[in-house]
UniProtKB/Swiss-Prot annotation:
Originating species: African swine fever virus (isolate Tick/Malawi/Lil 20-1/1983)
Name the UniProt record assigns to this protein: Protein MGF 100-3L
Organism lineage string: Viruses, Varidnaviria, Bamfordvirae, Nucleocytoviricota, Pokkesviricetes
Function noted in UniProt: Plays a role in virus cell tropism, and may be required for efficient virus replication in macrophages.
Domain of life: Viruses
Family: Belongs to the asfivirus MGF 100 family.
Amino acid sequence: MGNHLDGSYQPNMVMSIEDKQNKYNEAKERSKVCNKVYINQSGKIDKKELKRIKKLDFFYSQKNDDEIERMFFNMPNGTFLLTDDVTHENIYIAQKDLENGSLNIAKLEFKGEALYINGKNYFFLENYLKTFEDIYKYPLTNFNENK
């Protein structure tokens, strides 16, 4: 079924289709996303955001909505970056909680040389990442500005 980000999807697991669906639904219900970036607090998919997220390098754009959603919930906990282009326009950082799997997503704002996340100037992304004990950095998207 193509490439998998963390190897957690194992198609040959001894688990019924119903069990797999139940496990997936439970994970979906447990997940809450701040600022309604990916999933509304109600747990319903924000289709407009999903269309945008399908373009992110973090995901495989050829996947359908359900596959993208499943990949998202199978990601290990930690911190990672999402981006949908190589500019400063749409770069997000996501932190998946280590205990309950909930997700916080914040947009990175660049103002001149300053990097603002949630209104606080961190100067460098590394300074922000250092505020978290367990950091998962895949896939950190590298980009170069062509000026």
